[in-house]
UniProtKB/Swiss-Prot annotation:
The chain crosses the membrane at residues 1-21. The Tat system comprises two distinct complexes: a TatABC complex, containing multiple copies of TatA, TatB and TatC subunits, and a separate TatA complex, containing only TatA subunits. Substrates initially bind to the TatABC complex, which probably triggers association of the separate TatA complex to form the active translocon. It comes from Rickettsia massiliae (strain Mtu5). Belongs to the TatA/E family. This is Sec-independent protein translocase protein TatA. PANTHER family: SEC-INDEPENDENT PROTEIN TRANSLOCASE PROTEIN TATA (PTHR42982:SF1). One of its GO terms (biological process) is protein transport by the Tat complex. Keywords: Cell inner membrane, Cell membrane, Membrane, Protein transport, Translocation, Transmembrane, Transmembrane helix, Transport. GO terms for molecular function: protein transmembrane transporter activity. InterPro entries: TatA/B/E, TatA/E. Part of the twin-arginine translocation (Tat) system that transports large folded proteins containing a characteristic twin-arginine motif in their signal peptide across membranes. TatA could form the protein-conducting channel of the Tat system.
Length: 53
């Protein structure tokens, strides 16, 4: 039950309406930084588990 293209477009439209065109680049930048930090955290957690074994 993944997101189809139409669902993705609706979500993007809602985000655009809520934040407006001026603030949207900042919101996307913050989201990208958050995702990168999450991925880096997941990598760190995986390597810690290997050391404990």
């Amino acid at each position: 039950m993944g997101m189809s293209v139409s669902h993705l477009l609706i979500v993007l439209l809602i985000i655009f309406v809520l934040f407006g065109a001026g603030k949207l680049p900042q919101v996307m930048s913050d989201l990208a930084k958050g995702l990168k930090a999450f991925k880096d955290g997941m990598k760190d957690d995986g390597s810690d588990n290997d050391k404990n074994k």
